[in-house]
A protein has these predicted regions:
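Adenylate-forming
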Residues: 119-170
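Acidic/glycine-enriched edge-of-secondary-structure segments
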Residues: 42-52, 111-123, 143-148
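Short, flexible helix-coil linker/hinge segments at the edges of structured domains or between repeats
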Residues: 94-130
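Short, well-ordered, mixed-charge alpha-helical segments that flank or form enzyme active sites
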Residues: 83-87, 109-116, 155-157
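Nucleotide 5′-phosphate-binding alpha/beta core
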Residues: 1-36, 42-74, 80-83, 140
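Short amphipathic alpha-helical face segments that pack within enzyme cores
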Residues: 55, 59, 89, 153-156
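Conserved AMP-binding loop of ANL adenylate-forming enzymes
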Residues: 66-104
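Short loop/turn segments at strand-loop or loop-helix junctions that form parts
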Residues: 36-39, 102-109, 151-152
């Protein structure tokens, strides 16, 4: 059995080193995406991605009700954008449904550094900056009707949207 022959995979193997070592010969000539996790705890774990994010999110798209996530609607993603699989996936989801994905990047590694340095005021300013960028995009682009964000960003966005009678499907 292959699993017995190969042994248990160690997640730490993903930290550093040539990423191409994980690309099998069958995919060596395919476009490869890389994404990272765990960068706030040292060298990030780098993982490869070929087409699975497209396949996953095209299937996911079929579960979205068109009345809540209209085809052709533009999307706004507020969250970590790169190097993240999620950014690729949400951008592809918007495109697959006929829309454009606008992005506001949130750098969680920077937020963690600010917290570790005790820079809570600076962290709050950064959070406000991210929300302000999102609101600017929402005001500038009437076609944005769908939102992908983290729960911690959703609340302040809603607090700023509802009084101004702006609405998106979240």
């Amino acid at each position: 059995d292959d699993l017995d022959r190969l042994g248990e995979f160690q997640a730490e193997w993903l930290r550093g080193g040539p990423v191409r070592r994980w690309v099998t010969r069958a995919y060596k000539d395919q476009p490869i995406y890389t994404f990272e996790t765990g960068g706030s705890t040292g060298v990030p774990k780098s993982r490869i991605n070929i087409n699975d994010f497209r396949i996953d999110y095209e299937l996911y798209s079929k579960t979205l009700p068109d009345d809540k996530f209209p085809k052709g609607a533009d999307w706004l993603m507020v969250g970590p954008s790169g190097p993240r699989r999620l950014r690729l996936a949400i951008e592809h989801l918007a495109q697959h449904r006929g829309g454009i994905c606008f992005m506001v990047d949130l750098d969680p590694r920077w937020v963690i550094k600010l917290i570790k340095m005790g820079e809570m005021e600076m962290m709050e300013l950064y959070k406000r900056h991210v929300i302000d960028q999102a609101l600017t995009l929402l005001r500038a682009h009437d076609g944005i009707h769908c939102l992908f964000t983290t729960p911690k960003r959703l609340k302040p966005l809603c607090e700023n949207l509802w009084p101004k009678k702006m609405a998106i499907n979240a």
